[in-house]
Structures are given as C-alpha cells and as structure tokens.
C-alpha cells in the first residue's frame, strides 16, 4: 500500500551532512526574511504577538495595531498560559489588556477567538467580526455541539468506524473549553471598511479554511492580515464545517447535494465543498497587489503569488493521485485517507477526511468521478466505470 509521504531513504554520511547544511541554510534565510518582514510591519504600526496554543499547529499569531483605536486582531485560545503570554507581549509594547479599544476576530476557530470574551470584559473594547459569524460567536457552546453532530454524521457516512467517531466526539468536546462565547458589537460586512485614525482596512470574506475566514487589507501599505487564509509553512486545511447561520438562511456557494437548508446542521447532506470554495478565495487573493501577508501561524509571506501557485499545484497533484486510487477500485473517503496516510492518530481522522473530500469534490466538479451510497455509506468510483 503506497503512502503519500514515505520514510526517507538512507543516505551516505556525507550526503546527510550536505542536506543538513542546506536545511540550516534555508532556516537562516527564512529567519532573516521573517525579521525583515516583521520590521516592515512594525514600521506600519503592526506588531506580531505569538500566543501559545494546546494544538498541533503551535503558536497562533495575534496582531497589535498601534493606531486609534488601539486594535488587536485575534486573541489566542482561552487558557491561562495564552493570557499570561499575551499580557507579557502587550507589556513589551507598553500596553495592558485594559488599553485595547478594538478587538477584531478573523474567523470562528477557537485558537483565534477563545480569549476574546475575557479581553472584551476587561478592556471594554468593541468586538468586530464578520456579520455572518456573529451568531456563531454569541452562541458558541450550542454551535459547537451542532458542529460535533454534523461532523459525527459526516464521518459515519464516509466510512470512519463508529468507535473512532466516538473517540473524536469526546476529544472535540474536550476542546470546547479553549473557546468561549463572545458578543460581536461591531459587525463587519464583506467589502466594507474598518476605519482607524491612520489607516483603513478593507474587510474581505475569504471562506474555505472555515466558512467565516476574513482578511483585512491595508491597500495604502499593500499589507494584508490574512489569519489562516494563507500560511507559509503549511497548506491551510479546508475543514468541512456547517455553513454559518446566515448562509443557511440566505444561501451559500458550492454545496454538494443542493442548496443548504435549515436542517443542514443535523443532516449529512448537503455538505459544503470547502476546497472548491477555498481555491476560489485564493484566486481572488492571488490577483491582489500585496507586499506583505501577515498570517495566523508562522512567518510572514512576501510573495503571495508564488505561494498560492504552489498551493494550486499541491491540490492538483493530490486530486490526481486520489483520482488514480478511485480508478483502481471504488473507495470510501476513509479508505482513501488510509491509503494516502496509513493509520494516522485518531485525533487527525477528521482532518484527513476533510482533505480527501475536498480533493474528491474537485474530481466531482470535473466529472471524472461519481459517488454512490449503499447502507448509509458513500463510495466514490471512476465516472467511466
């Protein structure tokens, strides 16, 4: 059984030393580029605050904009450690939590908004976020429960064993404490503006990684605060998620199985085509004139076009590989994930399922595969079979 990333073959000591030197040289180039990019951001009054998270992705980047009002973009997760390090980072800039006047939330993932409620309560800051995500943030506990139900039914429908689903449900329930409901007091609209004294940020909805991904574009300085829309060192996983409440009411693009309905959160179909939507969002960002992209994780990006083109190639190659697996024999999405990555950690099962279904959706869109359901489980087969 082939694997997406097989173990590296053994190399002679001299070759290993050369490869190690190349890796160290690459890391040094990245460090210097990061320092230069962060200095450019600092000149624009934007400062990265790297906040710890309990998740595999590592630290999350919040951004302090020293303007009027004093603005913090994203908060980090709801944990004592995250709050402590955020306070220390603010102190290095001569500020306290109580000084924050505007708190901006980029999207609905808990590593980005978990502390928002505490920060807003302590500072009295306005809380700004895309209008579509405001109901989710205000009712986070109930929304998280519906998210889990949606994920559970989706996993069972695509072949993940019930015992694995049970474990994942428990893990997800444990994660909820890292988030907390928060009331949005300043709803933002796609294409609207967030005006500060010395700059105006254009608000752009860029769904895909999540339904609510929002980026903030300083057109004058050609700087984008992109959160998880674009990350240098990893491909942002377009996670399968329930559509936002307003999308369920007003309609949302790119669904498999028809338009979303009020029952979507408790029904296995239709499901959002997250990767199709994400690629469309990346196309829009690719066309923009940007000098600097400040990401939600990792280092800044200074050539967004090259990075997006690399992501497009990655998705094309993966879709082609999945297409070959399906052409060999009909498979469930879970079977495809096992073929590509083997028996990954149980906690990663939903991530790999999202990855597979995203690329299958590209094949479904192109008409090269079809899907069939038997006994409540979906299998994909080549369209010619």
Question: Model-predicted segments: where are they?
Answer:
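C-terminal regulatory/interaction regions
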Residues: 2-11, 16, 22-24, 320-385
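Conserved beta-strand hairpin/beta-sheet module of binuclear metal-dependent hydrolase folds
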Residues: 36-95, 216-232
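Short, structured coil segments at secondary-structure junctions
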Residues: 42, 122-123, 289
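Short Pro/Gly-enriched beta-strand edge/turn motifs at strand-loop
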Residues: 42-50, 170-178, 197-199
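Active-site HxH/HxHxD metal-binding segment of metal-dependent hydrolases
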Residues: 58-59, 81-83, 90-195
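Divalent metal-coordination and catalytic microenvironments
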Residues: 65, 74, 107, 119, ...
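Metallo-beta-lactamase
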Residues: 71, 77-79, 174-176, 180-183, ...
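Short hydrophobic/aromatic-enriched beta-strand-loop microsegments
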Residues: 124-129, 225-227, 311, 348
